[in-house]
C-alpha cells in the first residue's frame, strides 16, 4: 500500500557549491577544490537537479522508499557540509599511571605504552582523513563524515580496556566533541 502519491525532499544548493547528478543515482559535489562522489541507488527513488535544488523523490512509494528518501537527503546534506566546511572530531588522551605516546605514521595512529604494554596498539586512518596530535589533544578532520567518524572510532576502540574494571582503569583516548557537538 503506497504511503502517498509522491514523496519529495528538496535540498538547497549553496552558492559556493556545484552539484552534478549522473544517471539519477550518482551525486558529485564540488566546492573550493574539494570533491566528493557518492552513489545513492534504490529502486523507484530518483535523484535529480532542478534549478538551485537537488530533489530526491519517488512516485507511489512504500514505507521503505519513504524512509530511503529521507536518508538520501541527509547524505546529500552531509556531503554539501563536508566539502564546504569539513568535519572535525576532538579527542582527549587520558591516563593515570602510564603516560601514552601517540604518533601518526602513514595511515596508522600508533599508541605506545598503553597501560604499560610492551607492544604498541594501532588504529587505521581512513582515506582522505587527517589526524593531528598536540599534547593531550587528538584532532581528526576530513570532508567525508563517515570516514572521519570511523577514524575517530578506530582510535577510541584501539584503546579499549578489556578484562579490567573500566570504572578503575579509565585510560584511553575519548571523543569529547564531534562535528561541533560537545559530548
UniProtKB/Swiss-Prot annotation:
UniProt key word Ribosomal protein: yes
Family the entry assigns: Belongs to the universal ribosomal protein uL6 family.
GO molecular function, one term: structural constituent of ribosome
This protein's name: Large ribosomal subunit protein uL6
Assembly mode: Part of the 50S ribosomal subunit.
Gene label: rpl6
Keyword terms of this UniProt record: Ribonucleoprotein, Ribosomal protein, RNA-binding, rRNA-binding
Gene3D superfamilies the UniProt entry points to: Ribosomal protein L6, alpha-beta domain (3.90.930.12)
InterPro entries reported for this sequence: Ribosomal_uL6-like (IPR000702), Ribosomal_uL6-like_a/b-dom_sf (IPR036789), Ribosomal_uL6_a/b-dom (IPR020040), Ribosomal_uL6_arc (IPR019907), Ribosomal_uL6_CS2 (IPR002359)
Single GO BP term: cytoplasmic translation
A Pfam family matched in the record: Ribosomal_L6
Purpose of the protein: This protein binds to the 23S rRNA, and is important in its secondary structure. It is located near the subunit interface in the base of the L7/L12 stalk, and near the tRNA binding site of the peptidyltransferase center.
Source organism (scientific name): Methanococcus aeolicus (strain ATCC BAA-1280 / DSM 17508 / OCM 812 / Nankai-3)
Matches recorded under HAMAP family: Ribosomal_uL6_A
Gene Ontology CC: cytosolic large ribosomal subunit
Amino acid at each position: 500500500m503506497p504511503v502517498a502519491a509522491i514523496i519529495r525532499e528538496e535540498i538547497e544548493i549553496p552558492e559556493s557549491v556545484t552539484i552534478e547528478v549522473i544517471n539519477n543515482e550518482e551525486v558529485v559535489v564540488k566546492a573550493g577544490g574539494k570533491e566528493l562522489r557518492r552513489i545513492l541507488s534504490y529502486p523507484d527513488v530518483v535523484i535529480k537537479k532542478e534549478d538551485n535544488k537537488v530533489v530526491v523523490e519517488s512516485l507511489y512509494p512504500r514505507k521503505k522508499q519513504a524512509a530511503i528518501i529521507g536518508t538520501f537527503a541527509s547524505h546529500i546534506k552531509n556531503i554539501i557540509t563536508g566539502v564546504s566546511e569539513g568535519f572535525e572530531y576532538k579527542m582527549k588522551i587520558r591516563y593515570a599511571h602510564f603516560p601514552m605516546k601517540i604518533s601518526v605514521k602513514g595511515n596508522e595512529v600508533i599508541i605506545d605504552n598503553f597501560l604499560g604494554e610492551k607492544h604498541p596498539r594501532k588504529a587505521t586512518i581512513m582515506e582522505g582523513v587527517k589526524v593531528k596530535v598536540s599534547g593531550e589533544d587528538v584532532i581528526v578532520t576530513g570532508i567525508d563524515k563517515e570516514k572521519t567518524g570511523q577514524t575517530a572510532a578506530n582510535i577510541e576502540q584501539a584503546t579499549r580496556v578489556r578484562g579490567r574494571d573500566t570504572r578503575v582503569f579509565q585510560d584511553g583516548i575519548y571523543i569529547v566533541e564531534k562535528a561541533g557537538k560537545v559530548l
